[in-house]
A protein has these predicted regions:
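Small cysteine-rich, disulfide-bonded extracellular modules of the LU/uPAR three-finger superfamily
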Residues: 1-105, 112-299
Length: 299
């Protein structure tokens, strides 16, 4: 189950008389390798940095090339959903007080310290061409970063062996209309939250047939048979871009044959069908291991 990630920047300045103007509209950025790794171990969206280099972004970078200023002042947070385009998003606006970011700026980044970058980009003009913008000494600079998560549109498949018997597994994104509510809002918070911080849960279902798993906009339509405990597997391994979860169902209350399982995680809501049903009674503990993966979206 792999979630694709993307980000965009927007720049606006406010003059002393209160009037505002957009000086660089929405443009894509490069999520760095350091940023992809940071998702597996900690928060990543607490600081914004601006600087003066025109060097092209590359995945191995970890900081701005020529940093001038940084801000951890968060003006606004919002989350949203674009069902037709298959993503949900966080928008966080960082404010640089008048004079803090004054000068000629050509690069920008967001990250989790005053220097370490989750992403880096060159500032571009309205045509998308790298440019230099000028912020005057009496102007306030607001930089908005939009972080997107795209849910997978293709099913995964696997074979599960339990007590010598084989079961066919189909995995799929679930209830994508709630992704921005159940996970993205948690990411926003103080900005310090990460995949390690939230452990939402796991549910088992019984009855029905694999087709009852349903499409990506709904939860499984089988009968619910109880909730379990979701915990993390091994510690994050650098450059793996994945975390493992283990769903546990103790002897009670889940005592029915299991035909589907739903996982709710920071990286999305996912479900899987199990065919044939896995038998379970009040003497069994059932556990299932899954991996959530993430990747840089190709822009």
């Amino acid at each position: 189950m792999k979630t694709q990630l993307e980000g965009r920047f927007k720049f606006q300045v406010t003059r002393p008389d209160g009037t505002s103007r957009v000086i660089s509209d929405w443009s894509p950025n490069l999520i760095l390798d350091a940023g992809l790794n940071r998702i597996g171990s900690g928060g990543f969206l607490t600081h914004c940095m601006v600087g003066g280099s025109s060097a092209a972004p590359s995945v191995g970078q970890t900081t701005l090339v020529t940093k001038y200023a940084d801000s951890s002042t968060i003006l606004t947070d919002s989350v949203g959903l674009e069902l037709a385009s298959n993503y949900c998003y966080i928008r966080r606006t960082f404010r640089f007080a008048a004079g803090v970011a004054a000068g000629n700026l050509s690069e920008v980044g967001v990250g989790w310290t005053e220097t370490l970058c989750f992403s880096r980009a060159l500032i571009v003009d309205m045509a998308g061409v790298p440019t230099t913008i000028t912020v005057l000494g009496d102007e306030i600079l607001d930089v908005t970063y939009e972080f997107r998560m795209y849910w997978p549109l293709v099913d995964g498949s696997a074979t599960l062996t339990v007590d010598g018997s084989s079961y066919n597994i189909v995995s799929r994104a679930s209830n994508v209309g709630d992704w921005h509510l159940s996970m993205m809002a948690q990411f926003v918070g103080s900005g310090s939250n990460s995949i390690n911080s939230f452990n939402f849960g796991v549910n088992a279902y019984t009855g029905g047939v694999p087709a009852d798993l349903g499409g990506i906009t709904v939860d499984p339509s089988m009968a619910g048979s109880g909730s379990g405990t979701l915990s993390y597997g091994s510690a994050y391994v650098n450059n793996s871009y994945e975390r493992s979860y283990v769903g546990y169902f103790i002897p009670t209350p889940v005592v029915l044959p299991i035909t589907a399982v739903k996982f709710t995680t920071v990286l999305g809501i996912y479900k899987l069908s199990i065919d044939p049903a896995i038998p379970k009674d009040n003497t069994n503990t059932f556990s299932v291991n899954v991996k959530c993966q993430w990747a840089r979206r190709v822009i």
